[in-house]
C-alpha cells in the first residue's frame, strides 16, 4: 500500500499518484498505473472543480494507463485532460502558474516498471536536478543497467533523488522467485490437472482487477485454453491480451471474481457458478498467487505449496524483492532516497537504515563526466586555525642559492678524501714532508652565498709534467688514494678557506704553489697589517705584495687527486701578508726548499674575529730590497706557538674564482730574484733552536708544531 503523499521536494508543483489535499494546487498530475492505492482523489469533486477552473492542468500517463482508466465511467471527465507520453521517449512539458504566469520547463521520460500493464517510472530532469519516481515496480537484478535512458555518456545519470517502491524492503523477502519461475510452477500444476478430464477446472484466485495478465496470457498460450474473466471492456484496446481472455464460462481455467467477498456458492467453488452440462460434478482446485504468505514462512518452500485438499499457494510478486531493491538502488546510487511504502512491522527509520548506505555522499565532488580521463588538480590543504604559524615554517617555494661553509679542515696527510671529526683541534704532522688531506666539514652555523656558478665544461684540471713528478720524490708526489666509489665533493669545498701555516712547515715551503685552475690570486692584504679589521686578504693595488702565480706552474707543486678529477677548481692554501709592515723585515724563501703544512680548524666563534697571529709573535725577515727579484715568492709571517683565543680567528673572505679565467691571474713581481740559502741561515738557526721570530704583535695565531 503506497504511502507517498504525492509531492517531491525537488519539484513541488508536480503531484504523482496522489490527487487530494495539498496536491490540488499542483500545476501538473502524473499517474504511474491504475491501482486504487495510487488513485486517491482522482475522481473527487474537489479535483473536478479544479479542472473546471483551470485550462492548463493536465494528467500525464502511459497510453495503456489511459485506456484502463477511461474504461470506468467514473473517470470519464478526465478524457480531455489526459496527455499520453510514449514509453522511453523524453518529453518536455511546461509547468505554468496560471495566476502569475511563471513557467518551469521539465523533461519527463517514462520507463517500464514491470508491475502491471501500463505501469511506468517517471524520470524528471530540470533546473532542480534529476529525480526518479519508481511507483510500483518489479525489476530483476541487472535490469536497470539495460535501460539506456538511465545512462548518459556510458554511465548512469547523476540522479539526485529516488522515490522508491519499498513494499518488500524487508529481509524476510530477501529472495522472491522470478515471474518465470512462478509461471513454470503454476503451468505444471494446471497442466497436470486440466488434462485429466474436461471436468477438471482451475480457478486462479486473483485479488486485483488486473495485473495478472502476464499469467493469463502465458497459460492460455501454453495450454490452448482461454481464461474466463468477468469483463473484457478494459482490454478492448489491447488485442494481445484480449485474444487470450473470454467471458464464456465453459472453459477449464477461470479468473472470474465474486461479486462480493462473502458471496460464494456452497455447492460450487467457482465464482461464476458454472456446472457441468450432464450434471457431472466439477473437480476444481484453486491457486492463489501471493507473496506475503511466503514471506511469513520460516523455512524454505517450493514455488507452489499445497495448503488444503484442493487449494494451493503460488509465489507470485508484483514488487521487487529485498535483494532486487538493493541491487537497483546501488546501481543508480542517488544522493537521496525516499521510501514510498512502509513494510508491515517496520518503521521509516528502519527502512532508511537499509537504504541510506546504498546512496552516495552529497559532499562528493568527483566529476561525473571525464572524457579526457582523470586530470590533475591542485591539492587542497585545510589549515587548522591553531596552526597558523605553520604558514611561515614551510620552506621557500623558490630554489635556494648554493651555500659555501666557512670552515674547512685540512690535515697534514696525503691528498685523499677522508672524513675528519670536527672535535679535533689540531692536525697530525708528517716528519718527512707536508702531506695534506682535504676534508670537507660543513659548518652548522655560518654559511656564505656562492655568488657565481662554476661550469664543468669551462675548465679542466692540469696534471704535473712527468719530470716534475719524478724530481719531487715519493714524499712530495700527490697520492691518489681516494676511493673512486666515494661521492665526488662539490667545488664549493675549495672556496673561502682560512689557511694557517705553522712554523716548522717553513723548512719545507716551496717557492710557489701551483693552482689547479685559475683560482683567486689575490691573497695579499691591502692593510699594512695582516690581521686588520678588514676581512679582505687580497688587493690588486698592493704593488709590493708577493703573489701566487699560476704562470710559473713549473716551479710549483701541483696538487691533484684521483678522486677529485671532476672538481671544477682548486684553492690556494697559503695566506700572504703585506710587504708594507711597519718595522718588519721580509725574508724570501728558497724555491723547493720547503713544503707548507696547512691547517684549518675554525669554529663559529673564531670566524667572527679578525685575528690570525698571536700577540707575542716575532720575526727576523730580510728587507724588502732582497726579495724583489723572486719570480714567484711566498711571503709569510712566521709565528710563535702561543695560541690565541678562538674568538680572535680571522674571518677569511678570500673570494675564489669559479670561472677559470686568466683575467683573475696576477703576474709575479718584475725583476724578482730567488733568495739564496745564505740569506736564510739566520732564520734557520732561530727556527732550529725554537726561538721566537717577532714581526709585530697581532691578535692572530697559527698553531705551533
Curated annotation (Swiss-Prot):
**What does UniProt say on post-translational modification here?**
Phosphorylation on undefined residues by PRKDC may stimulate endonucleolytic activity on 5' and 3' hairpins and overhangs. PRKDC must remain present, even after phosphorylation, for efficient hairpin opening. Also phosphorylated by ATM in response to ionizing radiation (IR) and by ATR in response to ultraviolet (UV) radiation.
* One Gene Ontology term, aspect cellular component: nonhomologous end joining complex
Where is it located? Answer: Nucleus
SS bond partners = none
PTM-bearing positions, type Phosphoserine:
385, 658
A single BP term in Gene Ontology: response to ionizing radiation
What family does this chain come from, according to its entry?
A: Belongs to the DNA repair metallo-beta-lactamase (DRMBL) family.
Q: What is this protein called?
A: Protein artemis
Q: Which organism is it from?
A: Mus musculus (Mouse)
Instruction: Write the gene name.
Output: Dclre1c
Amino acid at each position: 500500500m503506497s504511502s507517498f503523499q504525492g509531492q517531491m521536494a525537488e519539484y513541488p508543483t508536480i503531484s504523482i499518484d496522489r490527487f487530494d489535499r495539498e496536491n490540488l494546487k499542483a500545476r501538473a498530475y502524473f499517474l504511474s498505473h491504475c491501482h486504487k492505492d495510487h488513485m486517491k482523489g482522482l475522481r473527487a469533486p474537489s479535483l473536478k472543480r479544479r479542472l473546471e477552473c483551470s485550462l492548463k492542468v493536465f494528467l500525464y500517463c502511459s497510453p495503456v494507463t489511459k485506456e484502463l482508466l477511461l474504461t470506468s465511467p467514473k473517470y470519464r471527465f478526465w478524457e480531455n485532460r489526459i496527455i499520453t507520453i510514449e514509453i522511453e521517449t523524453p518529453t518536455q512539458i511546461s509547468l505554468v502558474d496560471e495566476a502569475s504566469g511563471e513557467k518551469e520547463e521539465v523533461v519527463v521520460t517514462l520507463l517500464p516498471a514491470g508491475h502491471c500493464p501500463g505501469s511506468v517510472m517517471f524520470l524528471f530532469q530540470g533546473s532542480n536536478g534529476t529525480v526518479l519516481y519508481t511507483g510500483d515496480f518489479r525489476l530483476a537484478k541487472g535490469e536497470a543497467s539495460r535501460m539506456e535512458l538511465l545512462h548518459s555518456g556510458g554511465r548512469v545519470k547523476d540522479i539526485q533523488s529516488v522515490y522508491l517502491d519499498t513494499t518488500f524492503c524487508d529481509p524476510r523477502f530477501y529472495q522472491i522467485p522470478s515471474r518465470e519461475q512462478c509461471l513454470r510452477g503454476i503451468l505444471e500444476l494446471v497442466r497436470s490437472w486440466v488434462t485429466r478430464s474436461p471436468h477438471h477446472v482451475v480457478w486462479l484466485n486473483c485479488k486485483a482487477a488486473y495485473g495478472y495478465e502476464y499469467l493469463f496470457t502465458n497459460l492460455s498460450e501454453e495450454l490452448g485454453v482461454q481464461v474466463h474473466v468477468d469483463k473484457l471492456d478494459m482490454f478492448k484496446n489491447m488485442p494481445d491480451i484480449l485474444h487470450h481472455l473470454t467471458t464464456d464460462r465453459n472453459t477449464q481455467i477461470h479468473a472470474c471474481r465474486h461479486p462480493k467477498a462473502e458471496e460464494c456458492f456452497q455447492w460450487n467453488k467457482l465464482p461464476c457458478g458454472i456446472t457441468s452440462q450432464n450434471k457431472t460434478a466439477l473437480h476444481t482446485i484453486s491457486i492463489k498467487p501471493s507473496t506475503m504468505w511466503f514471506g511469513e514462512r520460516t523455512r524454505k518452500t517450493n514455488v507452489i505449496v499445497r495448503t488444503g485438499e484442493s487449494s494451493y499457494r503460488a509465489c507470485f510478486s508484483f514488487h521487487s524483492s529485498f535483494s532486487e531493491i538493493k541491487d537497483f538502488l546501488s546501481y543508480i546510487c542517488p544522493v537521496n532516497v525516499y521510501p514510498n511504502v512502509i513494510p508491515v512491522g517496520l518503521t521509516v527509520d528502519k527502512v532508511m537504515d537499509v537504504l541510506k548506505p546504498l546512496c552516495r555522499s552529497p559532499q562528493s565532488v568527483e566529476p561525473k563526466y571525464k572524457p579526457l580521463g582523470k586530470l590533475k588538480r591542485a591539492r587542497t590543504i585545510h589549515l587548522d586555525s591553531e596552526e597558523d604559524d605553520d604558514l611561515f615554517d614551510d620552506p621557500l617555494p623558490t630554489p635556494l642559492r648554493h651555500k659555501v661553509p666557512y670552515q674547512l679542515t685540512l690535515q697534514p696527510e696525503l691528498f685523499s678524501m677522508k672524513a675528519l671529526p670536527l672535535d679535533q683541534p689540531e692536525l697530525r704532522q708528517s716528519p718527512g714532508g707536508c702531506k695534506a688531506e682535504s676534508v670537507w666539514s660543513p659548518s652548522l652555523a655560518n654559511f656564505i652565498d656562492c655568488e657565481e656558478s662554476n661550469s664543468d665544461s669551462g675548465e679542466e684540471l692540469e696534471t704535473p709534467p712527468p719530470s716534475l713528478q719524478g724530481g719531487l720524490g715519493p714524499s712530495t708526489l700527490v697520492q691518489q688514494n681516494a676511493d673512486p666509489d666515494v661521492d665526488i665533493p662539490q667545488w664549493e669545498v675549495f672556496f673561502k678557506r682560512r689557511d694557517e701555516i705553522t712554523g716548522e712547515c717553513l723548512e719545507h715551503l716551496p717557492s710557489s704553489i701551483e693552482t689547479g685552475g685559475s683560482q683567486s690570486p689575490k691573497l695579499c692584504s691591502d692593510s699594512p697589517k695582516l690581521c686588520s679589521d678588514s676581512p679582505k686578504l687580497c688587493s690588486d693595488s698592493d704593488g709590493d705584495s708577493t703573489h701566487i702565480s699560476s704562470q710559473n706552474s713549473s716551479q710549483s707543486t701541483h696538487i691533484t687527486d684521483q678522486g677529485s678529477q671532476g672538481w671544477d677548481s682548486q684553492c690556494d692554501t697559503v695566506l700572504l701578508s703585506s710587504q708594507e709592515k711597519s718595522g718588519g723585515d721580509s725574508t724570501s724563501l728558497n724555491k723547493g726548499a720547503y713544503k707548507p703544512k696547512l691547517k684549518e680548524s675554525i669554529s663559529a666563534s673564531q670566524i667572527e674575529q679578525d685575528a690570525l697571529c698571536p700577540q707575542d709573535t716575532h720575526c727576523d725577515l730580510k728587507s724588502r730590497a732582497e726579495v724583489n727579484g723572486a719570480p714567484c715568492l711566498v711571503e709569510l709571517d712566521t709565528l710563535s706557538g702561543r695560541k690565541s683565543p678562538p674568538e680572535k680567528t680571522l674571518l677569511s673572505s678570500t673570494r675564489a674564482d669559479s670561472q677559470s679565467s686568466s683575467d683573475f691571474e696576477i703576474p709575479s713581481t718584475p725583476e724578482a730574484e730567488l733568495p739564496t740559502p745564505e740569506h736564510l741561515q739566520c732564520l734557520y738557526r732561530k727556527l732550529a733552536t725554537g726561538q721566537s721570530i717577532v714581526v709585530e704583535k697581532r691578535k692572530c695565531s697559527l698553531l705551533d708544531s
